[in-house]
Amino acid sequence: MFGTATRESATRVLLLGSGELGKEVAIECQRLGLEVIACDRYPDAPAMQVAHRSYVFDMLDASELEKVIAAEQPAFVVPEIEAIATDKLVELEEQGLNVVPSAKATKLTMNREGIRRLAAEELGLTTSPYRFADNYQQFVEAVEAVSIPCVVKPVMSSSGKGQSVIKSPADIEKAWQYAQEGGRTGAGRVIVEGFIDFDYEITLLTVRAVDGVHFCAPIGHRQEDGDYRESWQPQQMSENAIKAAEYTAEQVVNALGGYGIFGVELFVKGDKVIFNEVSPRPHDTGLVTLISQEMSEFALHVRAFTGMPVNKIVQYGPSASAVILGNGQSENLRFDGMSDALEQPQTQLRLFGKPDINGRRRLGVVLTRRSSTEKAVDAAIESAKKIKIIY
């Protein structure tokens, strides 16, 4: 049963994180008449612009987080980012708070160590070889154990921050320093991963709902500097690889529990899949589903966590997304060239409404549907180039 937003009966959804993914979740909640409260560490974040009200605070501050939850009494708490006081969510969940998909999932996936140990050590899934390190000496030993080339990541970071590849011994000290600067909570523990020889990587959006586990068509993507630049759906895979991917994803989401969508990241080599990471929420590469599916990843997330059946996920055909990336400084961003960017049919545009920029920032995305994924990607890239950012 849902109440009516802004009334005593309101069913409240508290978003922890208010970026572009949270904005789309907020819009889907609004479609169902849910009351949306958006939180983030900075004002005028994208989801705040489509919410009923908002709070600005550091969500790693457990006491502030508890105050907001106590004030709002939400039916659902929906994390959109990792940098949250997850121990407090676990504590409040034990007292009856509904955390999406679960406080356990939010806590485990907040850092790479929890989810890697779950996948490799508890579930026995194939992953890259790995070691953890707390200091430089341990780090040097970890690199030696895993062997060069290897990938270094802070255990707590997102969007590629602090990640680098060690290609020779000369890179070791530089990689350590870069990882220490890139962690979400400052300097700290890192993971050293063996370099994987793979054909491609995918995001398998996996929905855990009241009527079972459902899979979206696999999403391929291209990364640059740790961030996705284009994504496409479906990624062509062998039947055996799809079965292996779905098996791996189902094992992971069932271990994490709760209802919602999970972005399961996998490397694929031939018919084999290697588990990489999982996000217990919509995934940035899944923005393509805004044009590729009857229900986007955001609609699926809301449908699942509110306890409604998913039934069937309908895919519309080869589709792509291309990021509109800003690089500059401004507190008054403007955009031009939209008419040129949208001159072709089956082309859509989303501008995220981010209030400012200081350096590099994802500001929007172009979405396309074509007769093949290759054509869709090319068209999305060309359209994205036509958007002019005025700083």
UniProtKB/Swiss-Prot annotation:
One of its GO terms (cellular component) is cytosol. ATP binds at R112, K153, S158, S159, G160, K161, G162, Q163, E193, G194, F195, I196, E201. N(1)-(5-phospho-beta-D-ribosyl)glycinamide binds at E20, L21, E80, D284, K354, R361, R362. Its EC number is 6.3.1.21. InterPro entries: ATP-grasp, ATP-grasp_carboxylate-amine, ATP_grasp_subdomain_1, PreATP-grasp_dom_sf, PurT, PurT/PurK_preATP-grasp, PurT_C, Rudment_hybrid_motif. One of its GO terms (molecular function) is magnesium ion binding. Residues 117-306 form the ATP-grasp domain. The keyword Metal-binding applies. GO terms for biological process: 'de novo' IMP biosynthetic process. Pathway: Purine metabolism; IMP biosynthesis via de novo pathway; N(2)-formyl-N(1)-(5-phospho-D-ribosyl)glycinamide from N(1)-(5-phospho-D-ribosyl)glycinamide (formate route): step 1/1. It comes from the Bacteria. Involved in the de novo purine biosynthesis. Catalyzes the transfer of formate to 5-phospho-ribosyl-glycinamide (GAR), producing 5-phospho-ribosyl-N-formylglycinamide (FGAR). Formate is provided by PurU via hydrolysis of 10-formyl-tetrahydrofolate. Belongs to the PurK/PurT family. This is Formate-dependent phosphoribosylglycinamide formyltransferase. It comes from Vibrio vulnificus (strain YJ016).
